[in-house]
Amino acid sequence: MTVLVEVREYDPSKDLATVEDVERRCEVGPAGKLSLFTDLLGDPICRVRHSPSYLMLVAEIGPKEKKELVGMIRGCIKTVTCGITTKRLDLTHNKSQNDVVITKPLYTKLAYILGLRVSPTHRRQGIGFKLVKAMEDWFSQNGAEYSYFATENDNHASVNLFTGKCGYAEFRTPSILVNPVYAHRVNISRRVTVIKLEPSDAELLYRLRFSTTEFFPRDIDSVLNNKLSLGTFVAVPRGSCYGSGSRSWPGSAKFLEYPPDSWAVLSVWNCKDSFRLEVRGASRLRRVVSKATRMVDKTLPFLKIPSIPAVFRPFGLHFMYGIGGEGPRAEKMVKALCDHAHNLAKEGGCGVVAAEVAGEEPLRRGIPHWKVLSCAEDLWCIKRLGEDYSDGSVGDWTKSPPGDSIFVDPREF
C-alpha cells in the first residue's frame, strides 16, 4: 500500500524531538537478542555535518493541519578517487628504455546515503523509496556522478530496497575490525618509534603516497584539520635514522624519498564526541561477567587479562583511518600504531577502537580485533547517477574490480 508522502528538508527547530522519537522506535531490538543502539547526542546530522556538502530530509504523511513525521534520511557529497591514470615520460627519447611512468588519481563526485529510517508502524508503504529518490535528486542537482550506501550483509530489507527498487549494485565488501579498550594501557614494542605528524605534513604524506587509493577524499586537508581528528602517526624501526622521534623527522617528502626498510602510518578520529553506542538485550549474567573481567583488568593489570569492554552502557569509540605502510615489517609497524591508538582511546574514556579496511587489505593482520565484535563483511552498494563530472575517461566505476585497499573517510563512519 502506498500513501501520500511529503518529503522536505529537516528543520531542527521543529523536528528534533520527533526525529529522536522515530530513531528510538527504529532501534528497538528483538526480545532476547543483543542489539546495538546509537545515541546521536541531540544532533541527528552529526554523521554528515563534517562533509563538504550535506542534507537531511524527513518524510511526513497526513493532512496539512496534522502532519506526522514518519521517516528520515541523510546524505552528503564529496570528491574522491575512483581510479588512476598513467602517463609515460620518455626522458631519453628512446621509446624502449628509461621511461618514467607517472600515476595520478582520477576523481569523481561521490554521494553517500546513510541514516535511512522509517517508523516501524509505517513500513512497506513506499516511504523509504521516496526518501531515497528525493535524496538522489539532490545529489544529481549538485553534480554527483555516483551514490553509494553501506549496510550489513544480513539487513535484507535495506539490501532489497536499494538493489531492487533503487537500482544499486553490490560493490565492495570491506571489514569492520573492532578491538576493546582494556582497563590497562598496552605496551608498544620497544623496537618501534611512533612519531606524531603536523596536519600539513600528514596531508603531504597522504597525497604523495595514498591519493590513488580508492575512495581517497580530495579534501583530505579538511579531514586532518578537523577538530575531531586526534592526529596522524608514523611508526618506524627504532634503529632507523628516524628512530629518535620527532627531532629526526625530515618532512614527508624527504621521508618518502629515503624511507626506512619498513614503516606505517595511521590517523585517529574521535567519534565519541559525535555519537555514543550501547549494546542492549544482554542477560544479567553477561553483564556480571563483563564487569568482573574489567575489575580484574583494572586492579591486576600486570596479568594482561583481556577484559570485556563496557558495552552494556553508553560508550564512545575512536576510529583508525588512513592506514598504510610499506616493507617486510609493515604489519608490526601497524600493530604498534594500533596499540598507540588503544592507549589514546583509554585516555579518552572510550570503550572500543575500530577500523574499516578492504577485504584484501595487505596490512589487516596487523590490526588487533575481536572477531565477536567485528563485521567480517560490511556491504557497500553503488549506483551511477550521471556522467558529467569525473575528470577523465574512467568508464563506469560501478563495474571496476576491487583494489587491495580503500580509504575510509572517518567523517561518515
Curated annotation (Swiss-Prot):
Q: Per the record, a Pfam family?
A: Acetyltransf_1
Q: Per its UniProt entry, what is the enzyme's top EC class, as one word?
A: transferase
Which residue ranges does the record assign to the N-acetyltransferase domain? 5-187
Keyword Metal-binding among record annotations: no
Keywords linked to the UniProt accession: Acyltransferase, Transferase
Q: Name one GO molecular function term.
A: acyltransferase activity, transferring groups other than amino-acyl groups
Query: Which cysteine-cysteine pairs are annotated as disulfide bonds in the entry?
Result: none
The EC number(s) attached to this protein equal 2.3.1.-
**Entry's PANTHER family?**
ACYL-COA N-ACYLTRANSFERASES (NAT) SUPERFAMILY PROTEIN, N-ACETYLTRANSFERASE HLS1-LIKE-RELATED
Q: Which family does it belong to?
A: Belongs to the acetyltransferase family.
Q: What is this protein called?
A: Probable N-acetyltransferase HLS1-like
